[in-house]
Amino acid sequence: MNERPITMNDIRNRADEAGFASLRRRAFLLGSLSAVSAAAFPAAASANSLRLEMILRDPAAPVSGNPAGKLTMVTFLDYNCPWCKKTAVPMRDAVLKDGDIRVVYKDWPIITKDSVEGARLALAANYQGGYEIVHHALMAIKARRAEADEMRAAVRATGIDFARLESDLKSRETEINALIERNHEQAMSLQLTGTPAFIIGKFLVPGAIRSAEEFTSLFEKAREQV
C-alpha cells in the first residue's frame, strides 16, 4: 500500500490530539541507551544507512557547536516541551566544554499547534544565521504552553532582524515546511514517541538528559563505539 507524504496539516493535527503529550517518555537514565541499528528502522535494512545519513546530514537542518566536530549529536525538540527546556542549557554547556561536538537540530513540533509556529520562527531565523539565538530564546520562555504571540515577542527581544525573519517566513515557507515534514518522518522512522530525543554517535537516547555531566558521559560512551 502506498502511503501519502506527511503534510504540515498532519503535523498540526497530531500536535492537537488529546493525550499525545502524555505518551512522551520523560526521563531515561544512562542504562536505557540503545544502539541505533537496522532494528530501529521499520523500512528495509538496505535503506537504513541512507535514512540515517539524511538524519545526520540534511543540508537544511540547523547546525551548531563545532560544524566540523568528529562526534555528531542530533536533537529532536519542541518549544512547548518542558523537558526540552530543562535540557537546553545543560546541552549547550556540555557542547561548549567539549569543543568537538557537531549538533544537528530537528524541530519536531508535536505538543501544541503553537509549537509549529515556534519551529517555523527558529528555522526562518536560520537564513540570517540566527537559529541558535532564537532557539535559546524560545527555550527560555517560562510558560508551560507558550502561544504564538509570546514566542514572537521572545524572538523580537533577541534583536534579530525581525522584518527579514518575517520575509523569510513567507518566501521560504515551502522549504521550512518541507524540513519540518522531513523531521517528522525521521522521528517516526526512529519510532520516537516524543521529545526530547537524541542521537549521540551510534546511540539513540529517547528522553531527557538532565545535566551537562550526563551529556559528557554520553559523549564519552559514544566515542568508545566509533
What are these regions, as identified by a protein language model?
Residues N48-S64:
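Short N-terminal segments immediately surrounding and downstream of signal-peptide cleavage
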Residues T72, G99-R102, G129-E132:
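Loop/turn elements at helix/coil->beta-strand transitions in domains of secreted/extracellular proteins
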Residues C81-K85, F198-I199:
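The canonical Cys-X-X-Cys-His
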Residues K85-K97:
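Typically the conserved alpha-helix immediately C-terminal to a functionally engaged Cys/Sec
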Residues P67-N80:
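Short active-site neighborhood of thiol/selenol oxidoreductases, capturing the structured segment around
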Residues P109-T195, I199-Q225:
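Cysteine-centric redox/oxidoreductase cores and disulfide-bonded domains
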Residues M1-L23, S34-A38:
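N-terminal secretory signal peptides
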Residues A21-L30, V36-L52:
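N-terminal twin-arginine translocation
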